Amino acid sequence: MNFQNLANQMKKMQREMEKKLAEFEEKEYQYEYKKLIKTTLKGNLRIVKLEINKDLIDPEDPDTLQDMVTEAINEALGDLEKKRDELSNSITPPIKFPGF
């Protein structure tokens, strides 16, 4: 494989990756935490919607609700990060250079 072909292949892969990442960032992903908190996030890590089961809302114990919301969002973000990494790895297979 000559250098020009390799450069063209890399440019094509970069365009494909940019397109797929842009699609990923616009897509909405829904998560449910213990059937009590539902979150909808975009792939760009923006929260679109947050629904809290009314049974969780206790004016005398806001800390529990805050902790659960934090945990729900962190779980959703962690899953999105994993999906983004899987997408990136599926688009850019390792390039093998002769002699290395």
Curated annotation (Swiss-Prot):
Family assignment?
Belongs to the YbaB/EbfC family.
Keyword DNA-binding carried by entry:
yes
Q: Which domain of life is it from?
A: Bacteria
Q: Which SUPFAM superfamilies match?
A: YbaB-like (SSF82607)
Q: What does this protein do?
A: Binds to DNA and alters its conformation. May be involved in regulation of gene expression, nucleoid organization and DNA protection.
Localization annotation: Cytoplasm, Nucleoid
Q: Which UniProt keywords apply?
A: Cytoplasm, DNA-binding
Subunit composition and interactions: Homodimer.
Q: Does the keyword Cytoplasm apply?
A: yes
Q: One GO cellular component term, please give it.
A: bacterial nucleoid
Q: Which GO terms describe its molecular function?
A: DNA binding
NCBIfam families tied to this protein:
DNA_YbaB_EbfC
Q: Which organism is it from?
A: Mycoplasmoides gallisepticum (strain R(low / passage 15 / clone 2)) (Mycoplasma gallisepticum)
Tell me what this protein is called. Nucleoid-associated protein MYCGA6000
Query: Which N-terminal residues, if any, form the signal peptide?
Result: none
Q: What PANTHER family does this protein map onto?
A: NUCLEOID-ASSOCIATED PROTEIN YBAB
